Amino acid sequence: MNTSHKTLKTIAILGQPNVGKSSLFNRLARERIAITSDFAGTTRDINKRKIALNGHEVELLDTGGMAKDALLSKEIKALNLKAAQMSDLILYVVDGKSIPSDEDLKLFREVFKINPNCFLVINKIDNDKEKERAYAFSSFGMPKSFNISVSHNRGISALIDAVLSALDLNQIIEQDLDADILESLETPNNALEEEIIQVGIIGRVNVGKSSLLNALTKKERSLVSSVAGTTIDPIDETILIGDQKICFVDTAGIRHRGKILGIEKYALERTQKALEKSHIALLVLDVSAPFVELDEKISSLADKHSLGIILVLNKWDIRYAPYEEIIATLKRKFRFLEYAPVITTSCLKARHIDEIKHKIIEVYECFSKRIPTSLLNSVINQATQKHPLPSDGGKLVKVYYATQFATKPPQISLIMNRPKALHFSYKRYLINTLRKEFNFLGTPLILNAKDKKSAQQN
């Protein structure tokens, strides 16, 4: 466990399903990060987030519910106990509206034995009359417990104060204040802007996204099972390759729209939001069986969010057909992603995992690329001379100049006399020419045509 205040303190929220762990997590994080609902066992993976409690930065873990009869309960329990062992403080949450069960008491004692730095948090004590119900939890043997109501925001401030006191954080900010101020004054603002590559892992249910996340991070952060749809919340993990940080987001598996039920609807919305923040998508395809229509639909998410993309062919050790046949099918079905690099892997055997990491950095460099204006115009001029622009009803169509106005992804404006006359086929020709000249591997290239007036306004 962490002992130095220079190391980020870790708080784990544990307890049985549907007692309010994710709601407490969201309340402390002041953001709806974990999905909450009336379904027991909504959280299946460990959500992790750096948050600030009264100005003190800590790391908060929200774990899956440890129900005895729950599917995957052994795997979830093992992950939770591991989180408990690694944490500086545990918030064990119980439902104050329910009678304490023998199973709950047994689980609490097991957690307490692993890590005695533990608070008993009795949730759903919505008013003073309901405080009497909390006495039923005296059998847990804790000298002090915390009666709270996350939904009514009762008792949260007192809990936060106790957490900071238990972690010895109240004194730290006073001791380090002067040094922190001096350090911030000496540090240029641009040095504080740390560039982290955000990578979203997308794919159908049970294609191996969580296994890929675990292989990339070398941690069992994401629960892996043959049960389809094990991951519900998008969860993230950051690794370091050289001096480059990469944050992976393992998103919920996507089903056919007609099969999306209950909590998975929320999970799909969270996946969309996670991709909005991503730079690159790892599209995981299961090659133990032929590709399906849903694979193609999911691949369009990368295009929708203008992400860099890498195609990851998982379960290669049990592929359904020879290499040549699979690649030929891939090129036919995913023709619009012909610029995307393809990597074969077996996550369970850690095949080509390092190659994926380095390819992410390579694609990100292309995704962030800026072409010098003179060089860009030279290539565009050569392309238009080699294949002149088609006329517009007999009238000359002309490109005055080109300029790149954005990166991530690269966006280029063609300033023209008749921008509406630029045919999509000629636009595709120019994009392919730029790809060939400047190597935009795995990167969408956005080309817009504008007239001089609109270009000057922008």
UniProtKB/Swiss-Prot annotation:
Keywords from the named record: GTP-binding, Nucleotide-binding, Repeat, Ribosome biogenesis
Binding residue positions for GTP 2: 203-210, 250-254, 314-317
Domain KH-like as annotated: residue spans: 369-453
Binding locations of GTP 1: 15-22, 62-66, 123-126
Disulfide bonding pattern of the chain: none
InterPro entries, per database record: G_ENGA, GTP-bd, GTPase_Der, KH_dom-like, KH_dom-like_a/b, P-loop_NTPase, Small_GTP-bd
Source organism superkingdom: Bacteria
Gene Ontology biological-process entries: ribosome biogenesis
This protein's record includes keyword Repeat: yes
GO molecular function, one term: GTP binding
PROSITE patterns in the cross-refs: G_ENGA
Annotated Pfam families: KH_dom-like (PF14714), MMR_HSR1 (PF01926)
Domain EngA-type G: 9-171, 197-368
Biological role: GTPase that plays an essential role in the late steps of ribosome biogenesis.
Quaternary context: Associates with the 50S ribosomal subunit.
Family statement drawn from the similarity comment of this UniProt entry: Belongs to the TRAFAC class TrmE-Era-EngA-EngB-Septin-like GTPase superfamily. EngA (Der) GTPase family.
Protein name: GTPase Der
Organism field: Helicobacter pylori (strain ATCC 700392 / 26695) (Campylobacter pylori)
